[in-house]
């Protein structure tokens, strides 16, 4: 096909951007158009004509525009693919095609007539290429090797937090005690609209944990301040998003009587925590606490060492970065800033360029050292970090199956961490022993 088109270089900034103008030979274009129309004529069924017997003029009238559009797409795809393949440009990140002009196909000729008239098919191909990245020199890197100094106070604090998590409701015996937020209240209540009892509106021994949002907020709010044995009546409004359609937007009169109140009480003794979580003994509880603290310590220390490495790579290596990838990264960062309610302060473009550069360096590292990921790597990553996404492990796994963009994002993060761990394993270390307080302070100052 090379003889059927001419290519003119429009832009080559000696970096990553390329632009070329393609001019397609008119005789070639019209010969292909005639062939396309003849193909249509042989196969199309037109009322009143046997297959293949409709005149070419009728075929042109009905199918010329579609035939031209299909032909232009095919010629652009074939010529640009051939040019890129023969040009040995390396990895192309993004490409864009814009048609500048096309022949006046209304004046086109058949293969038996004279020269075609009008403009040539001319289009512009723009693309960016992946830069040549240097291989990271591992012998030049020194990173911190942070060892945890877990103290008895850390273990005690962890166990105290466990006690709060396994709090239990204790029945209130004080007749003057008034319901507070977080209390569990057992009530009898009746619901009426215009004096008529609602279906299921006469309920006994309903347990409500005030503030959980499992009943209407107006109902919860009215319970606050009530005592055991107290009764009261009040109106409520069913909201527009209420689950029972015929009650949406309606008002009801509620009568409620508090029968019992339970207040939340934290477990105070270690032996109760041991019993609640079914530990063998107190030493097993402390070992569990130490292990969990160590896991969190390792997670934070990895984040700190990762930043050390990224800062070093950003300072040491300078490469051109593709503008199209930087633009996408800018959009991601702006979304992150929006999600954080503006609490993140950052030079968006500089941060985007840094992220793209680091990504290119790490990809080069992964390819050179044949580093790849598998399902176990992905699950291990999710199991470690799923709480960072604010949803359950099962929800993350479901998103991984159903959301391609999320799956690609996770795969990218897993590969990034695997390459970083590979680098950390091989570079020189500066050993440091730190307490959890020192480590958290360092994290805050990152």
From Swiss-Prot:
Which species does the entry assign this protein to?
Ehrlichia ruminantium (strain Gardel)
What reaction is this protein's catalytic activity? Answer: [protein]-peptidylproline (omega=180) = [protein]-peptidylproline (omega=0)
Q: Keyword Methyltransferase: yes or no?
A: no
Which residue intervals define the domain PPIase FKBP-type in the entry?
A: 182-267
InterPro entries found in the cross-reference section: PPIase_dom_sf, PPIase_FKBP_dom, Trig_fac, Trigger_fac_C, Trigger_fac_C_sf, Trigger_fac_ribosome-bd_bac, Trigger_fac_ribosome-bd_sf, Trigger_fact/SurA_dom_sf
Q: Where in the cell is it found?
A: Cytoplasm
Q: Which NCBIfam families match?
A: tig
Query: What main location does UniProt list?
Result: cytoplasm
Record keywords, A-Z: Cell cycle, Cell division, Chaperone, Cytoplasm, Isomerase, Rotamase
Query: Known Pfam families for this protein?
Result: FKBP_C, Trigger_C, Trigger_N
Q: What is this protein called?
A: Trigger factor
């Amino acid at each position: 096909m090379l003889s059927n088109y001419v290519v003119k270089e429009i832009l080559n900034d000696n970096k990553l951007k390329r632009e070329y103008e393609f001019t397609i030979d008119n005789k070639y274009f019209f010969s292909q158009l005639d062939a396309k129309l003849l193909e249509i004529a042989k196969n199309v069924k037109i009322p009143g004509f046997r297959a293949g017997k409709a005149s070419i003029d009728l075929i042109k009238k009905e199918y010329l525009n579609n035939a031209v559009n299909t032909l232009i797409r095919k010629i652009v795809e074939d010529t640009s693919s051939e040019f890129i393949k023969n040009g040995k440009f390396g990895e192309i990140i993004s490409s864009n095609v814009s048609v500048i002009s096309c022949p006046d196909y209304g004046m086109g000729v058949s293969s038996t007539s004279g020269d075609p008239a009008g403009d040539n098919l001319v289009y512009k191909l723009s693309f960016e290429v992946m830069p040549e990245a240097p291989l990271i020199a591992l012998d030049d890197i020194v990173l911190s090797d942070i060892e945890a100094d877990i103290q008895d106070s850390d273990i005690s604090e962890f166990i105290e937090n466990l006690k709060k998590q396994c709090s239990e409701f204790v029945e209130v015996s004080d007749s003057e005690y008034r319901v507070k937020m977080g209390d569990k209240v057992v009530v009898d209540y009746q619901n009426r609209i215009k004096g008529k009892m609602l279906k299921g509106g006469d309920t006994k021994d309903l347990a409500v944990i005030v503030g959980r949002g499992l009943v209407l907020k107006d109902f919860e709010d009215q319970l606050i301040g009530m005592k055991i044995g107290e009764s009261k009546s009040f109106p409520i409004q069913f909201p527009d998003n209420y689950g029972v359609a015929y009650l949406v937007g309606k008002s009801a009169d509620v009568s409620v009587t508090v029968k019992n109140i339970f207040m939340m009480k934290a477990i105070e003794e270690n032996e109760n925590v041991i019993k609640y979580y079914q530990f063998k003994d107190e030493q097993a509880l402390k070992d569990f606490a130490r292990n969990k603290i160590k896991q969190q310590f390792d997670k934070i220390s990895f984040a700190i060492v990762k930043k050390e490495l990224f800062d070093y790579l950003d300072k040491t290596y300078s490469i051109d970065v593709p503008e199209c990838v930087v633009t996408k990264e800018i959009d991601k960062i702006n979304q992150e800033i929006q999600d954080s309610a503006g609490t993140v302060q950052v030079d968006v473009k500089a941060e985007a360029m840094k992220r793209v550069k680091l990504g290119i360096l790490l990809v080069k590292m992964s390819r050179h050292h044949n580093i790849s990921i598998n399902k176990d790597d992905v699950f291990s990553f999710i199991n470690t970090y799923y709480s960072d996404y604010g949803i359950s492990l099962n929800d993350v796994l479901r998103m991984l199956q159903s959301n391609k963009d999320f799956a690609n994002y996770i795969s990218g993060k897993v590969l990034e961490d695997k390459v970083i761990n590979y680098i950390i394993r091989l570079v020189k270390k500066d050993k440091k022993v730190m307490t959890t307080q020192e480590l958290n302070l360092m994290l805050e100052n990152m």
